[in-house]
Amino acid sequence: MAFLSSPSLRSSEEFLVLTSEFKDCYFKTGLSQGHRFYKLKIQNFIVPLMDIYQSGIRPILFSALKADPEWLHQQTLQLLGWLARTRERPPSSWVQSQLQKTYCLSDAAIEQTLWGLKFPNPLGLAAGFDKDGVAATIWGSLGFGFAELGTVTFQAQPGNPRPRLFRLAEDKAALNRMGFNNHGAEALVRRLDSLKVEKLQVEEGLNVESDAPYVATASSLGAATLPLSPDNLHPSPPAEPLNLSIPLGINLGKSKVTPLEDAAADYLGSFRLLKDWGDYFVVNVSSPNTPGLRSLQDSAQLGLILETLQQENQGLKPILVKIAPDLEWDAIADVVKLAQIHQLAGIVATNTTIRRDMLKTQRIEATGKSVNEEAGGISGAPLRQRSTEVIRFIHQQTQGLLPIIGVGGIFTAEDAWEKITAGASLIQVYTGWVYEGPWMVRRILEGLVQKLEERGLSSISEAVGLDSKQAGG
């Protein structure tokens, strides 16, 4: 069991992945030695393992080790990235099959087709976790119905100074001021292409020389530069698709070095590079961690960005906009109108909040400062109610005709059901997944199936906006 003590595997997600691997190794060994084991359903393990994680492992990771949350995050992606890159070869292929058995739930009741894309379930990974597509091909094996990469910017950028990610355990929340740290749009294209090449090499019996992660070079990061013009970028579409089991979204942000007046060109540059790689795209104008970005939610500025992207898009890919929870109702209504005018595919509601009045946490231990002194956005449980209110408002404003991806404070099946019945066709998690562990996805999906059965509904799409339908008689 040496792998359990590896110093490079310390995040909650990594530990739990290896715990699952250890469990299956144990049963396989026992069977090979002729011992008699009763076949146990995977569901029987989920509740006790959740209890072990929440009462034993999580307190150690969050408190006793006092490890930097960003460092733990990087360790998680390092492991998942290795699984993604080597997924067609043993032992990764075997590990991935065990992940699927443990974390995935297949049920026709929670499947739906939206924008011509088949979603095996409505629960996706929110943007921010896998900014550079390190583990793009693995998320379906962890039970997610879709995954959103990014936020990615046209120019590579380091983000804000560290520390920039803090856990607020008392609130089941996180405070982040990451600042769109990423390798840039071109590097994401190269990484996704490398994952595709890895698959083709294995299928064709070619030697794959290295398991080393893709690292963007200075030349690759600088190949696409501002100023942009319609003739600057002519990326070649992928010769072969990634053929993922789930839809892949890409979240686009503005480069920090780009003036606000050039924002439309900046978003366009990223979209041109990535449009053949994503199944849908999200325009992020709502992060509180890039100076002036939220001002792009203003009708004039946002209208120009959306018009520019849709002219390039020509209706080929679903484009959504992600909004802040801190907007007034009139401002949200304006965004909804713009979404309709520019024929957007939907709205993502919501991003993180800059409010602090709902927090129990008063001081950030890592910095010694008051939570009110620390810049950044709050995600997690404190955001649940407001994001649901925004979802309900948008659903009512559009009579349910504009699909919504609901995100903010989802930890349980009840939280997920609340957002779906408020009007969200799809939902996303990030902070909740970190707190609850990887079994959370399957637990939520099983809870949604149960709620559909209790209400006599045959499909998750029938539950979308159910609160509004019932209120209207």
Regions found by a protein language model. Give the residues of each.
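Glycine-rich phosphate-binding active-site loops on the catalytic face of alpha/beta enzymes
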Residues: 148-154, 346-353, 421-443
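Alpha-helix-loop-beta-strand connector modules within alpha/beta enzyme cores
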Residues: 173, 183-186, 191-199, 298-319, ...
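N-terminal capping/small domains of soluble enzymes
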Residues: 48-196, 200, 213, 242-245, ...
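C-terminal helical cap(s) of enzyme catalytic domains, especially alpha/beta-barrels
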Residues: 159-172, 358-372, 434-457
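Glycine/Thr-rich beta-alpha phosphate-binding loop at enzyme active sites
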Residues: 93-106, 285-301, 340-400
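Catalytic cores of alpha/beta
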Residues: 134-139, 327-339, 411-427
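Active-site glycine- and acidic-residue-rich loops that bind
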Residues: 255-267, 295, 321-340
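Short, basic, low-complexity termini and linkers enriched in Ser/Thr/Gly/Pro
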Residues: 3, 7, 15-27, 37-46, ...
